[in-house]
Amino acid sequence: MGRKKIQITRIMDERNRQVTFTKRKFGLMKKAYELSVLCDCEIALIIFNSTNKLFQYASTDMDKVLLKYTEYNEPHESRTNSDIVETLRKKGLNGCDSPDPDADDSVGHSPESEDKYRKINEDIDLMISRQRLCAVPPPNFEMPVTIPVSSHNSLVYSNPVSSLGNPNLLPLAHPSLQRNSMSPGVTHRPPSAGNTGGLMGGDLTSGAGTSAGNGYGNPRNSPGLLVSPGNLNKNIQAKSPPPMNLGMNNRKPDLRVLIPPGSKNTMPSVSEDVDLLLNQRINNSQSAQSLATPVVSVATPTLPGQGMGGYPSAISTTYGTEYSLSSADLSSLSGFNTASALHLGSVTGWQQQHLHNMPPSALSQLGACTSTHLSQSSNLSLPSTQSLNIKSEPVSPPRDRTTTPSRYPQHTRHEAGRSPVDSLSSCSSSYDGSDREDHRNEFHSPIGLTRPSPDERESPSVKRMRLSEGWAT
């Protein structure tokens, strides 16, 4: 297939004309170079374009060639455009048509080149669109952390934690919005986001505290979740986001504590301290999971008319199963459900009236038992000295229930030399579900968990009489 021929006429398109000039000028200089080398001659080219811009070429030196030209007086050959056209006609070639050695001079304006450029542009657009589709940002996971307290004028904290957010701050929310957010069968855990800092203690303590009605001088030193920032600033290296919802079908029953109905206008009593210390949930189905960001949630009853099991406590500090319970430990929990576990929901009314009758030895043993598990499992160091700010009187036995005199001392001695796992099983409550209803009527703790009523406070002689009757051995 022969070369494409172009018509030798003036190019009307300015851009095409400029492209053709540039290419053919270089081709002309290339031919002059080849001729000068092949035939050992001197060549000088002087070109002015349509804008009178000078382009020159000389095989050796332009001044030397021009000097020789001006001094040359011999006859010589001189050609013009008309001479070239006439010569081409004589040779049988059409002067208006010429084989184009540079057939791609106007490559930017030929139909073939336009199709090629159009295809290239389409490919580039497709590539850009694919990159945009692949650059979709990851979704944000928002997991709430709510901390309602049993007082009506308490604050509710919620923390929407995203995958890139900062879980260190707990913004405020309305209490009514978070009332049903803590179902006992669902564990909410925020996704891990690298090294996460600890929750500051000032954000977790109850913000609506009055010293009236609870016997404490400072509300922030009594029944709130007192967390020292130093213990919680431990960086936890997280690996992968744990499952967001864990149904009851995929895990064993959690250990829970039922809370008696709270007073309407008073701060949470020592029962909340005991609840905070005892209510550590163990997720046995997550034994393969790594340590993840904790979710600290406190939800206690807010109305005095609620039943014992109406709003169970959802206090939970969910971690990995570093101290998980084996099947033997779980089977041993049934013994403590009737003998030594502190099932707060089954405390009778008379026992609830003798909260401050707990002796110092029992309170210190209870605080040591629970704080040992907390310090080894979740670094939430709750000092046991909080529980010692109570009237120190011996524990009175139940009025209607008969209790052996040596039952409570045996319980404290049994707890003294126990490992953290066993102490957890003894300090934790019974399972969720139907076990709560069963153990209300079966077990009554010998330790009362609410302060005495005004009637009991005004009659100390009656309490001493019962004390002498119950412990006379």
Curated annotation (Swiss-Prot):
SUPFAM superfamilies, A to Z: SRF-like (SSF55455)
UniProt organism field: Rattus norvegicus
Polar residues: bias regions: 375-390
PTM sites of type N6-acetyllysine: 4, 116, 119, 234, 239, 252, 264
UniProt comment concerning the protein's domains: The beta domain is required for enhancement of transcriptional activity.
Record GO terms (molecular function): chromatin binding; cis-regulatory region sequence-specific DNA binding; DNA binding; DNA-binding transcription activator activity, RNA polymerase II-specific; DNA-binding transcription factor activity; DNA-binding transcription factor activity, RNA polymerase II-specific; DNA-binding transcription factor binding; histone deacetylase binding
Protein name: Myocyte-specific enhancer factor 2C
GO biological process: AMPA selective glutamate receptor signaling pathway; apoptotic process; axon guidance; B cell homeostasis; B cell proliferation; B cell receptor signaling pathway; blood vessel development; blood vessel remodeling
Subunit and partners: Forms a complex with class II HDACs in undifferentiating cells. On myogenic differentiation, HDACs are released into the cytoplasm allowing MEF2s to interact with other proteins for activation. Interacts with EP300 in differentiating cells; the interaction acetylates MEF2C leading to increased DNA binding and activation. Interacts with HDAC7 and CARM1. Interacts with HDAC4 and HDAC9; the interaction with HDACs represses transcriptional activity. Interacts with LPIN1. Interacts with MYOCD. Interacts with AKAP13. Interacts with FOXK1; the interaction inhibits MEF2C transactivation activity.
Compositionally biased spans, kind Low complexity: 419-432
UniProt xrefs under InterPro entries: HJURP_C, MEF2-like_N, TF_MADSbox, TF_MADSbox_sf
Record keywords: Acetylation, Activator, Apoptosis, Cytoplasm, Developmental protein, Differentiation, DNA-binding, Isopeptide bond, Neurogenesis, Nucleus, Phosphoprotein, Transcription, Transcription regulation, Ubl conjugation
CDD domains: MADS_MEF2_like (cd00265)
Residue ranges of DNA binding: 58-86
Chief localisation class: nucleus
Modification type Phosphothreonine: residues: 293, 300
Bias (Basic and acidic residues): 433-443
Region span, Beta domain: 271-278
Phosphoserine: modified positions: 59, 98, 106, 110, 222, 228, 240, 396, 419, 445
Region: Transcription repressor, residue numbers: 368-399
Residues annotated as site: Cleavage: 432-433
